[in-house]
Curated annotation (Swiss-Prot):
Superkingdom of origin: Bacteria
Species per Swiss-Prot/TrEMBL record: Helicobacter hepaticus (strain ATCC 51449 / 3B1)
The protein's name in its UniProt record: L-seryl-tRNA(Sec) selenium transferase
Pathway(s) this gene product operates in, as recorded in its UniProt entry: Aminoacyl-tRNA biosynthesis; selenocysteinyl-tRNA(Sec) biosynthesis; selenocysteinyl-tRNA(Sec) from L-seryl-tRNA(Sec) (bacterial route): step 1/1
GO cellular component: cytoplasm
Family: Belongs to the SelA family.
Function as written in the Swiss-Prot or TrEMBL entry: Converts seryl-tRNA(Sec) to selenocysteinyl-tRNA(Sec) required for selenoprotein biosynthesis.
Main location: cytoplasm
Reaction(s) this enzyme catalyzes, per UniProt: L-seryl-tRNA(Sec) + selenophosphate + H(+) = L-selenocysteinyl-tRNA(Sec) + phosphate
Keywords: Cytoplasm, Protein biosynthesis, Pyridoxal phosphate, Selenium, Transferase
Subcellular location: Cytoplasm
Gene Ontology BP terms: conversion of seryl-tRNAsec to selenocys-tRNAsec; selenocysteine incorporation
Cofactor(s) this protein requires: pyridoxal 5'-phosphate
Gene: selA
Amino acid sequence: MQHLLKSLPKVDTLLAHNELKMFQKSTLLPLIQSHLSLLRENICSNTLSPKELESALNEIIPVIKKKAIEATKPTLTRVINATGVVIHTNLGRSVLSPQILDEITPFLRSYHTLEYDLAKGKRSERYTHTKQILCEMFGCEDALLVNNNAAAVLLILNTFAAHKEVIISRGELVEIGGSFRIPEVMKSASSILCEVGATNKTHLKDYENAINEQSAMIMKVHQSNFKQIGFVKQCHIKEIIHLAQKHHLIDYFDLGSGHIGALPLADEPSVREICKYKPSLLSFSGDKLLGGPQVGIIIGKSQLIAQLKHNQLLRALRVDKFSILALQATLKAYQNKEYHKIPTLAMLAFTPKELESKAKNLKKRILASSIASELEVEVIPLHSLAGGGSVPHLSFDSFGISLQAKHLQVQDFEFALRALGLISCIQGEKILLDVRTLLEGDEERIMEILGEVLSS
């Protein structure tokens, strides 16, 4: 047994092997130690025959190399979203178009005036690059960016209501994804929650009766990821603004999803609509219905925005150059009515007729391919969702295809597709692919994935 154990190569010898030199020692060392330990166990337990051991020794380098490649593969990989959920939170929310990326890439590849005033030759603020366009679009006095809307909520509460009361309706104490709850955020911001009204009904008098010397703010939160129906009432933001002004308090509307108003989305409030009432502060997301990068956008009165800029938290919550450039390009597309540059808007605006045609073309490609005999394919009507915690009561008539593999169970089929980056849905014994959320080039990749799965 000892001579067999001595036949195992030394760790240092393997680390120095030409086939493994491309990998870091920190990656290789645990893989080598683990593999050698397994071989030692097999030798000591007489699990391997001499011939099997010889084969295992010859395979050490290829096995270690394969494991090292797997260990160093990026975990963030591209996938195809065939779920029909446009702003898919788990798949990165809104997608940026090639046109937007082409516009901002030259800036990312060079130095630029992120915080530099060319005219004065002095340092400037990074927030100036989007302030003008936001003020022009919404008629507000000033604007500020942070890294997401949750950061906007935290910054606003901490700046204006630390150790003071924030009045809010019980029906608006929402929780969004990742267990982000308004009451918990208030606690983190050192604000005191003053909840008024009932879960289903809150009247203006409920807010007014709660105002006292400790009150700093009346906050309204948009119920963006759920819908109350029936015996319900919530106060309009116009009423909240007037009440806050009457009592010299700050009114703040956390709009969340950030619908600009470019699409008719039933009764979903838009930023433009709310800005007509001149709120003190309003915040919303950049990567939901706006269709841009992940940012939190704060707009409102210049005096209040100036105070936000002096909060030390802003340094920890500030946006980077990519987000600023991407938002600026997205907003310019809105200004110029170039909605085709914003994939989120384009996908939500597809008509059922366009989607049916797209689904029929995909079916035709599959039936004309070498895997046609392995599948049953049908064009079917579907219902897409906006996603991103937005307009939960709305679905969009869509089309897609159903796939049923003749020699695979549906769960195994779905797993195989997912492993290669095709994210789909299961209905009964069939895989559903909603074509609404397919991007340019996705159909070609779908054909490759289906071919790989069904020909193996």
